[in-house]
Amino acid sequence: MKKVKEAEKRNIKRKKRIRDRIGFGVAERPRVTIFKSNKYFYAQVIDDIVGHTLASVSTIEKELSLNKNISDVKKLGEVLAKRLKDKNISKLIFDRNGYKYHGLIAGFATALREAGIDV
């Protein structure tokens, strides 16, 4: 049990360190944050000043019906980029939420960049 609590403390410390480094998302440049569960992948764009979610996308959405693999996560990045362009948002702050920048996370960020979003 002690190892689990220590790991949680390290994860929280890592997230806080990343969040302090990247800053807050504002209306001109909101923050896109990532969450991975064992089955699904979630991303949401947040305006931290107001505290609102501006856009979100996940593999759990029925109309997308995607799995949690790199090719499907890249499709999620394209869908999110389209939703952001509809709202005239072209710049984001990328919050990897403590995850390493490889695999799904890197694929998602690459798809956003290829779709024309400045991350």
Swiss-Prot record:
One of its GO terms (biological process) is translation. SUPFAM superfamilies: Translational machinery components. InterPro entries: Ribosomal_uL18_bac-type, Ribosomal_uL18_bac/euk. Keywords: Ribonucleoprotein, Ribosomal protein, RNA-binding, rRNA-binding. Pfam families: Ribosomal_L18p. GO terms for molecular function: 5S rRNA binding; structural constituent of ribosome. GO terms for cellular component: cytosolic large ribosomal subunit. This is one of the proteins that bind and probably mediate the attachment of the 5S RNA into the large ribosomal subunit, where it forms part of the central protuberance. PANTHER family: 39S RIBOSOMAL PROTEIN L18, MITOCHONDRIAL (PTHR12899), LARGE RIBOSOMAL SUBUNIT PROTEIN UL18M (PTHR12899:SF3). Belongs to the universal ribosomal protein uL18 family. Part of the 50S ribosomal subunit; part of the 5S rRNA/L5/L18/L25 subcomplex. Contacts the 5S and 23S rRNAs. This is Large ribosomal subunit protein uL18. It comes from Borrelia duttonii (strain Ly). The lineage of its organism: Bacteria, Pseudomonadati, Spirochaetota, Spirochaetia, Spirochaetales.
